[in-house]
From Swiss-Prot:
This protein's UniProt keywords: Cytoplasm, Elongation factor, GTP-binding, Hydrolase, Magnesium, Metal-binding, Nucleotide-binding, Protein biosynthesis
HAMAP family, alphabetized: EF_Tu_B
Domain tr-type G: start-end pairs: 10-207
Residues annotated as binding Mg(2+): 26
Region spans: G4: 136-139
Protein name: Elongation factor Tu
Assigned EC number: 3.6.5.3
Function: GTP hydrolase that promotes the GTP-dependent binding of aminoacyl-tRNA to the A-site of ribosomes during protein biosynthesis.
Entry's Gene Ontology cellular component terms: cytosol
Positions annotated to bind GTP: 19-26, 81-85, 136-139
Intracellular or extracellular location(s): Cytoplasm
Provenance organism: Syntrophus aciditrophicus (strain SB)
Catalysed reaction equations from the record: GTP + H2O = GDP + phosphate + H(+)
Record region (G2): 60-64
Gene that this polypeptide is encoded by: tuf
Length: 397
């Protein structure tokens, strides 16, 4: 059967939910799909279907990232539900990197919690351009003044991480009440629509990097029997058309191939564009030839490197970072795009050590090459915990 074509009639944005564990991110995602489905703009996704990876079921904690599709009257959204749990920051990093804007969910009954702060910090590091806040579980708070205080605290926290805290829309509601309701005139349901109006109005349509050379970080790789190998990911920049030559760059020697098909939401596209989540069919490539951490790119547009200068911010202990300084020879993981690579840090002449909270320049040598250019951002991690953030200031070799 021929696949249904994906129609591009509305602007497309990638958004998602972030926030502390159990503050209601997944419930809100389900409520959004329920009430947009009533307008024929989405398919309702129940809480369980969004929270669906088997190992998470027992604890009710979302570990993997769920992709949900819906529309408003103005836009088409691909929504990722990001895990809120500190153990799963890895997904948060690959997930938050996937957003043109985000909905920060905060339970009014708790106020901002450690992961709220951590996620705002990460949103800043991975450059999520804008945040809209959903103040959830307001039905559990009797005192309206308390809600005002939580809102004030949130605005201060956002300002602290260089988001425009005073301007950010904060919508109050109860995701659970909205999800359980069957009445479109219910005040809780109206708040879900109010939230989507705020997302439509406040999160700007991203400037797509359509004119830049094509590049897509590899998120996943699988085989479709009889058709070949498909790599999935979000197109970083440029346009890919069926028949285009591409290179697979990073981790191992660069390979040339041809893209023989582009798909999005299981529908065939003539082309994939910057910002789209797509699957690319690659000619003559085996599943074991490609891995997460590589990029698919226009030939000659990006090259693999192992050595670079970086500007790095080292998280404080309070931000969840290291408690102790590090020295030249420090060997953490450097998280580029979708994967961790071990590297060695060399501090500048005359710098003896780096303390948590410092902002420093350092030289980094990776053990495997990564497709790299100036301004590429990365996280520094130890045992799955983010301890720093950085940007490539100069490629050396």
């Amino acid at each position: 059967m021929a696949k249904k074509k994906f129609e591009r009639t509305k602007p497309h944005l990638n958004i998602g939910t972030i926030g502390h564990v159990d503050h209601g991110k997944t419930t809100l995602t389900a409520a959004i799909t329920k009430w947009l489905a009533k307008k024929g703009l989405a398919e309702f996704r129940a809480f369980d279907s969004i929270d669906n990876a088997p190992e998470e079921k027992e604890r009710g904690v979302t570990i993997n990232i769920s992709h949900v599709e819906y529309q408003t009257d103005k836009r088409h959204y691909a929504h990722v539900d990001c895990p809120g749990h500190a153990d799963y920051i890895k997904n948060m990093i690959s997930g938050a990197a996937h957003m043109d804007g985000t909905i920060l969910v905060v339970a009014a009954s708790d106020g901002p919690m450690p992961q709220t702060r951590e996620h705002i910090l990460l949103a800043r590091q991975v450059q999520v351009p804008s945040i809209v806040v959903f103040l959830n579980k307001v039905d559990l708070v009797d005192d309206p003044e308390l809600l005002d205080l939580v809102e004030l605290e949130l605005r201060e926290l956002l300002n602290e991480y260089e988001f425009p805290g005073d301007d950010i829309p904060i919508i109050r509601g109860s995701a659970l009440k909205a999800l359980e309701s069957e009445n479109p005139d219910d005040p809780d349901v109206k708040q879900i629509y109010a939230l989507m109006d705020a997302v439509d109005a406040y999160i700007p349509e991203p400037e797509r990097d359509l004119d830049k050379p094509f590049l897509m970080p590899v998120g996943d790789v699988f085989t479709i029997s009889g058709r070949g190998t498909v790599v999935t990911g979000r197109i970083d920049r440029g346009i890919i058309k069926t028949g285009d030559e591409v290179e697979i760059v990073g981790v191992r020697p660069t390979q040339k191939t041809v893209c023989t098909g582009v798909e999005m939401f299981r529908k065939t596209l003539d082309e994939g564009r910057a910002g789209d989540d797509v699957g690319l069919l690659l000619r003559g490539i085996k599943r074991e030839d490609v891995e997460r951490g590589q990029v698919v790119a226009k030939p000659g547009s990006i090259t693999p490197h192992t050595k670079f200068m970086a500007q790095v911010y080292v998280l404080t202990k309070e931000e969840g970072g290291r408690h102790t300084p590090f020295f030249t020879g420090y060997r953490p993981q450097f998280y580029f795009r979708t994967t961790d690579v071990t590297g060695v840090a060399k501090l500048a002449e005359g710098v003896e050590m780096v303390m948590p909270g410092d902002n420093v320049e350092m030289e980094v040598t990776l053990i495997t090459p990564i497709a790299m250019e100036e301004q590429l951002r990365f996280a520094i991690r130890e045992g799955g915990r983010t301890v720093g953030a950085g940007v490539v200031s100069k490629v050396i070799e």
